[in-house]
From Swiss-Prot:
Glycans are attached at residue 157. Pfam families: Lipase, PLAT. This is Inactive pancreatic lipase-related protein 1. It comes from Rattus norvegicus (Rat). Ca(2+) binds at residues 205, 208, 210, 213. Belongs to the AB hydrolase superfamily. Lipase family. The gene is Pnliprp1. Residues 356-470 form the PLAT domain.
Amino acid sequence: MLTLWTVSLFLLGAAQGKEVCYDNLGCFSDAEPWAGTAIRPLKLLPWSPEKINTRFLLYTNENPTAFQTLQLSDPLTIGASNFQVARKTRFIIHGFIDKGEENWVVDMCKNMFQVEEVNCICVDWKKGSQTTYTQAANNVRVVGAQVAQMIDILVKNYSYSPSKVHLIGHSLGAHVAGEAGSRTPGLGRITGLDPVEANFEGTPEEVRLDPSDADFVDVIHTDAAPLIPFLGFGTNQMSGHLDFFPNGGQSMPGCKKNALSQIVDIDGIWSGTRDFVACNHLRSYKYYLESILNPDGFAAYPCASYKDFESNKCFPCPDQGCPQMGHYADKFAGKSGDEPQKFFLNTGEAKNFARWRYRVSLILSGRMVTGQVKVALFGSKGNTRQYDIFRGIIKPGATHSSEFDAKLDVGTIEKVKFLWNNQVINPSFPKVGAAKITVQKGEERTEYNFCSEETVREDTLLTLLPCETSDTV
């Protein structure tokens, strides 16, 4: 697979020609900007629809496990299926060397059925994707035209509004969605899941996914390091109205296992091999999958850079709020700004990936001593583990703050537990405390204050309860 991703970028894999035309799809040439450029040096034409053999596999709430095939050549197959005109329609489009019946594609439909009634159409173009990369990148044009043709049939034959269509594309599939969107006026939404870099980054907008392809375009970047020398398959180029860079967008937590542990994976040899070769690249659809069932677990913060985000410079959310990366990104009030918007967040290293960000500020009390301070939050929905807030000289009256990403939303915060230690034997048995701890959840601007007049020895928990009104002034 690694060889396919790297070497095949430079293989020809098809005969050249000037232009080819297909019924209902239009004509495709090997002229610029599609070929003969520095980014696309090889002059290739896309394969024919017959050779690519794109299939449209419909799953609905009524048939969540067995698909119904919709045929471009026979629009009556739509009317004979469980397709419901009153529902939204979400197309899921796989990428390079993948297939429309892959587990993650079908699982995405199944997750949707848990939260909504929807027409979920898996676009299978495996015969066009399981070839050399450069040829597959050119086949994107025909597959995108076919997706647009299917939408056009829905519009003309079933009075279906394109505003109710959502295209979700991974890797090359993101650019398939872009091609389809550029052919479909009024398309509602496109989600690009780590749009691939090679042959697309730096090209004109008509070649790649861009914000003009739908009324709303959101993009998740998970493998945006340069292809050479880091083998980053995804693009770093801003491609939507909202671009999300989880964990900085280049190196995902949990993707640095050794080769054997990654390949001998719980999901099997094939899944394990895929994860070893393209773990960062695949994380984008795994985050989206989980976001469907976690409507508030992927809050993302506007920030100039991931460095600023990690330096706690982008907290809390601004007045208009923060978007949720993934399925619910379209709920964000500020989604349709004129300028592209960049957002950052952190995730877990494995399922569950969702995280909830908190800021904790504390005022120390007690003796001056060197050590580290930790805090745990307890709320109506559960409690966090202990998180490091400060290491260094613990000085009475000093204020320290830090942010952390918890594995759960604790709900209404009821109390805070404070712990300190210096891991050095101190015969004077000093006592330290927190006179006040202020907690703020990322999506909220409200601050919650907890107070205590007590001090404790190291490795002894101190519980702080909500301050009396006079204590918070």
